[in-house]
């Protein structure tokens, strides 16, 4: 018997990043981690910066960095509308490490709530990119 699946589209402002049949996905929603399996209840939620883990129809995994966006779950299709989406293979590790270093320095030198909040957001994005790079390397 074939595994239960559904259709997934991951779209950014620039292009369609993924379109295909999947077994499940994992993504960080506004209220926490979400695992979307076939037959999931309809849902519309914001996505926090982080990654989407895609388990394709035959079990292969793909990781994509998302800077945020919207997740829509319908009975037979799931759509991710991302602000920015970058495949793990396309991320630059040296650049992500430099962004992380700069954000950490900014946090240590921040002089107000706004500075700290912005630096914290930049740090979270850099860490998410590094995690996507790490998981993409492991999956290869």
Curated annotation (Swiss-Prot):
Function: Produces ATP from ADP in the presence of a proton gradient across the membrane.
UniProt entry keywords in alphabetical sequence: ATP synthesis, Cell inner membrane, Cell membrane, CF(1), Hydrogen ion transport, Ion transport, Membrane, Transport
PANTHER family named among the record's database cross-references: ATP SYNTHASE DELTA/EPSILON CHAIN (PTHR13822), ATP SYNTHASE EPSILON CHAIN, CHLOROPLASTIC (PTHR13822:SF10)
GO cellular component: plasma membrane; proton-transporting ATP synthase complex
Chief subcellular location: membrane
Any GO molecular function: proton-transporting ATP synthase activity, rotational mechanism
Any matching Pfam family: ATP-synt_DE_N
Record organism: Yersinia pestis
Protein name (record): ATP synthase epsilon chain
Gene Ontology biological-process annotations: proton motive force-driven ATP synthesis
Complexes and interactors: F-type ATPases have 2 components, CF(1) - the catalytic core - and CF(0) - the membrane proton channel. CF(1) has five subunits: alpha(3), beta(3), gamma(1), delta(1), epsilon(1). CF(0) has three main subunits: a, b and c.
Family membership noted in the UniProt record: Belongs to the ATPase epsilon chain family.
Keyword Cytoplasm set for record: no
HAMAP family in the cross-refs: ATP_synth_epsil_bac
UniProt topology in membrane: Peripheral membrane protein
InterPro entries for the chain: ATP_F1_dsu/esu_C_sf, ATP_synth_F1_dsu/esu, ATP_synth_F1_dsu/esu_N, ATP_synth_F1_esu_C, ATPsynth_dsu/esu_N
